[in-house]
Amino acid sequence: MKEFIIKANKAVTNGEINLKDLPGSSGRLDLICRCVNSAFFLSHDLRRDTIFYSVNYGNPNPPVALKFIGDELKRLSPDERSIAMFIQKALSKDASEIWKESTSGIYYSNHEFKEIILEKKNSGKKIFYLHLNGKPLENFDFKNESDVVFILGDHIGLSKEDEEFLEEIGAEQISLSPLELHADHCIILVHNVLDRLK
């Protein structure tokens, strides 16, 4: 299983989303929609072995965590507007500590970014932090890693506190490129590497 977790620093946390202005008034929700697209969509199918989390910290009710489970997703289209409509439906509900299903394969809760990562770590999963200054991807051998979790930052990135937390729990830093990439592009590159190991 491949899992991706992104901290969306400004992404809205309620259902008041302007579908015509995802980058602006919705706190770069366009970025999250593109990440969902990259995480799951193939030419004529969906990736069933992938889970994607967006932990939103924008106004008015942070945090709200969204979880997309590839094996359960239905009726989701690859365009940003369609994905945003499904996100809007989830964000229109009251989040609690319990994961609740909004639509098929899409869940919401008020879990914190660190809380979700720690849960993965405690369940024995290998944590990787995608970072410009990490070790080159080609230096890692994923053949024996069946359950991997990749941490991403949005356009703002992770805070120093977040990075210290990741270091404390033993997350390994991986660099995908000498250039700074968009989060959705990082997801595609990771998929490509892992696809070739099958």
Swiss-Prot record:
One GO-annotated biological process of the protein: tRNA methylation
Class of the enzyme per the UniProt entry, highest EC level: transferase
GO MF assignments: S-adenosylmethionine-dependent methyltransferase activity; tRNA methyltransferase activity
GO cellular component, one term: cytoplasm
Gene3D superfamilies xref list: 3.40.1280.10
Catalytic activity: pseudouridine(54) in tRNA + S-adenosyl-L-methionine = N(1)-methylpseudouridine(54) in tRNA + S-adenosyl-L-homocysteine + H(+)
Matching CDD domains: TrmY-like (cd18087)
Sites where the protein binds S-adenosyl-L-methionine: L130, G153, L176, S177, P178, L179, E180, L181, C186
Localisation: Cytoplasm
Pfam family, one: Methyltrn_RNA_2
Keyword Transferase recorded: yes
UniProt-listed Enzyme Commission number(s): 2.1.1.257
Function per UniProt: Specifically catalyzes the N1-methylation of pseudouridine at position 54 (Psi54) in tRNAs.
Family membership noted in the UniProt record: Belongs to the methyltransferase superfamily. TrmY family.
Stated name of the protein: tRNA (pseudouridine(54)-N(1))-methyltransferase
